[in-house]
Amino acid sequence: MNMIWVCGVDEAGRGPLVGAVVAGAVVLDPENPIEGLKDSKKLSAVRREFLYEQIMEKAKAWGVGEASPTEIDSINILQATMLAMRRAVEDLAARLGEWPSKALIDGNRCPELSIAAEAIVKGDTKEPAISAASIVAKVTRDRQMIALHEQHPQYGFSQHMGYPTEAHFAALKQYGVCTEHRKSFAPVRRVLEGSF
């Protein structure tokens, strides 16, 4: 008998100037609830890490997908976000061993999926599975930024996670761009054009 699995899907990293956009997909296990799921943006980094480990341990299945800076520059950030979400659902389905019945997507549009999907504005505050997906995406992306900081400490990625802050702008001005910067984003493009 096939179970009805509903997965939540959310992304992290649309706004940064560097790195991949990352999506998470999670099917929660009603027999193994996780307390305290909220939108990852409202949680401290320590709390997010704790909940991430709980999700890894207790969720029925989870998946991660991403779109690289090169893909973002090629197809634009919106399409890259949809691609990352689709990849996250595909990763979840591979781990689950079957496709979920439906995907609940945070936001106002859905990626092209081979299953039913529903967009829910502010879904990360309304649906626990979307909140869990938000946490998976955010922690995964933050870890990528910390690893990128090890390679390029001069940019301060571990502090601002690639977002367009004054410190990031100052580093761009001083050091130029690295290979992981999104060249289609205006501040990075201005550095490349010498007009920053």
Swiss-Prot record:
Protein name in UniProt: Ribonuclease HII
Gene behind the chain = rnhB
- What organism is recorded for this protein? Polynucleobacter asymbioticus (strain DSM 18221 / CIP 109841 / QLW-P1DMWA-1)
Example GO molecular function term? manganese ion binding
Q: Which PANTHER family match?
A: RIBONUCLEASE H2 SUBUNIT A, RIBONUCLEASE HII
Provide the binding site for a divalent metal cation: 10-11, 106
Entry's family note:
Belongs to the RNase HII family.
Pinpoint the RNase H type-2 domain residues: 4-196
Coarse class of the protein's main subcellular location: cytoplasm
- Intracellular or extracellular location(s): Cytoplasm
State the UniProt keywords alphabetically.
Cytoplasm, Endonuclease, Hydrolase, Manganese, Metal-binding, Nuclease
| One annotated Gene Ontology cellular component of this protein | cytoplasm
Q: Which GO terms describe its biological process?
A: DNA replication, removal of RNA primer; mismatch repair
Assigned EC number: 3.1.26.4
